[in-house]
From Swiss-Prot:
Keyword Cytoplasm part of the UniProt annotation: yes
Enzyme active site: C775 (glycyl thioester intermediate)
Lineage of source species: Eukaryota, Fungi, Dikarya, Ascomycota, Taphrinomycotina
Pfam families the UniProt entry points to: HECT
Keywords, in A-Z order: Cytoplasm, Cytoskeleton, Meiosis, Transferase, Ubl conjugation pathway
GO terms for MF: ubiquitin protein ligase activity; zinc ion binding
InterPro entries (alphabetical): E3A/B/C-like (IPR044611), HECT_dom (IPR000569), Hect_E3_ubiquitin_ligase (IPR035983), Znf_UBP (IPR001607)
Gene Ontology CC annotation, any one: cell tip
Pathways per UniProt: Protein modification; protein ubiquitination
Function description: Probable E3 ubiquitin-protein ligase. Has a role in meiosis.
Any one Gene Ontology BP term: meiotic cell cycle
UniProt-recorded name of the protein: Probable E3 ubiquitin-protein ligase mug30
Amino acid sequence: MSRPIEIANVSSGNRRTLPALHGSSFSSRSELDNNTNSKISRRLRELVCQRMGENPLRLRQSFHETISNDSYGNSEKLVIRPCICCNSVLRYPAQAMCFRCSLCMTVNDVYFCLSGSQIKTKASTDGSQFISVEHFVETIHQTRSALQLAKQRTGNVQAIVAAGLPLRELISLVFGSPPILNKLFSVKNGCSIQSSGLNYKLIYQLYHDITNLDILITNELLRAIESLLRRPMLYCHDPADYQYLLILLENPLLNSKSKNIVNKSSSILKRILGVLSNLNEKTHHFFISCFKKQPYNNPKFFRRKVDLINKFIGQRLMETYSRNKRKHYYNNDWQIKSAAITMALLYSANSQMRLIDRSSFYCIMADFINLYHDFELWEQKINCFCFCQYPFLLSMGAKISILQLDARRKMEIKAREAFFSSILSKMNVEPYLMIRVRRDRLLEDSLRQINDRNKDFRKALKVEFLGEEGIDAGGLKREWLLLLTRKVFSPEFGLFVNCEESSNYLWFNYSHRSKEIDYYHMSGILMGIAIHNSINLDVQMPRAFYKKLLQLPLSFNDLDDFQPSLYRGLKELLLFEGDVKNTYGLNFTINLKAVEGFRTVELKEGGSELSVDNENRKEYVLRYVDYLLNTTVKKQFSAFFDGFMKVCGGNAISLFQDNEISKLIRGSEEVIDWELLKNVCVYDFYDQNAISNSISESEPSMTASKYLCHSFVSKRKIILWFWDLISHYSLKMQKLFLIFVTGSDRIPATGAHNFQLRISVLGPDSDQLPISHTCFNHLCIWEYSSREKLKKKLDTALLETNGFNIR
């Protein structure tokens, strides 16, 4: 093998001294200056190449750019190429056969300069030494017996070392060569629709046998794998040549918690992910197909791989933060970027197979970074890693935080603009989006003001109910949006209709009138205002709606929750094994409801004359679904989308997936966990000092707090009665309670643990009704004398109160 040359790392700025290939000296100062200018010019050229020439998907490129002179004044030509592990842009002498990256210390072999036939010859030569499975298994058995004898008879360290020597040599040979690894664990039939071409049963067996023998053998396995990955020797002529990465990824030591193994296994994993992430696009597609086959098509197996890489990202974030003490420390970390790209491959496979929930890809440690700084870097297209490039890694809470921060920034900008406009024009310019409505004319007043083109809907929302004394600090706008959307999105209003009698979902009305287009535009603005102001709506829309909102392509499966009976019928048509033409008697037309009766529509030109048969039934189904979900509602959705983007236009909304945008708009669908809500609730009492004095002195932090947590008030009768009463309420009454206290009947999209309720006991027994401050999720009650009295007062408050007043 050629000895590697130490190479300057152009992208990171790290440099190792490269000895002059030809001696040179400068005869004059002008010659030195000219050479210096030349070096600066080339350096700028390299930086431009680095910034503009990289693949935006971070896929490996084998670009081969020659430079006339290096930056050391030598006339030797240099070549620029990315490292196969960390993707740093490197330069090396054109005649070199290998070079070492100064960042990740990986030796890169320059095989891409060989022809295809030369590469195949070299690959077959390197893998010519065949190791049979039987020989490997027999060596393991012999070593196990030899180790037992050595430990029983002598216990001598040298004897134990000698007993394991044959197996250690075999491990070094097998796990030090990609071709041998691929040959050893390949199945006879190779890749197929069901199999990735590897014998995973054999892989598990050999790993188990090797790692349960002796620590010296385990260490040799780790050493051989790390040595291989420090010089991968890639041949790049067939994606299947990289299957050895899947074999190495099955090493159980990667999940080890032993202190002696963790550092080595982490080093191995980062190199596996590094090489895998920097392969070319064709090979990435090959790995995605492997991730859809056995054993990856087992949800538990797939989940373990996702958890392994997520754990690696989390640990890396903690390690680098502890060294840098900066919240944007990870942006140039190649290990995190490599792990994220590998996760993208797994995510792509999961999107097609739906093996595990998409929330399984969330990296919880990413919630603790400076999310808005990450978002700004992504928006500015700075050439560095950002989590926003891989939004499936960000949790729902992280995305909501980014959206809220972005909305707050826009609101502040609008308020500042209003302030300066007031000064310059000497006129009062409203810094808020003010909506003033009469409760008995809610729909009429609201739509009139939303239709006002002079209003800026990106300002912070403030609502005033005329004739009421409520001051909007959050609660009034929540109730206004809740009441208004229930009317606008109800089937009685006419803009949206029920998809099917058996479905609760709403869809755009096919038989719209031209004058209703403006109403669709206003309903889009209304939904945008809700998201912009972090308010949940009571709107039942199918998955297809949210995918269209994010401009994602629709598929046949999106019809499932939209029109389930139609979906089942079309699926039966696709799976029917008999004669479709004579059995179904269909043609390329469909019947749709109109204002008066039904109307027949051709799915393609001449569709009424074209029968559906076994050959074209798939085309019929796709055209049917496309017409139903896209063509029939094109004008309605276009108006709705324009209104929505008028408020929510921007990059933050694109971070969400369709299931997440549904939660963002509607709130959490989960059943309310009142036990969890009780545990995060805080309290304050009219006799709080008495309670505080009863708390042990060993817990001074709680006595100093303004509010008390549940554990310190749980024995008070009024608290026991209250939670017992709430837990026994019907679902309808529980929703009324949420509306009474918060102004909305839903908990936040991130769940009950992020929803804090505050309960104040205002005084001793009283005949007054409970009071709520919806702006602050605050309930005020009195210490009623009995459970029955508490129930009577609370029921009255929930069922009979309406409107906002100041007491």
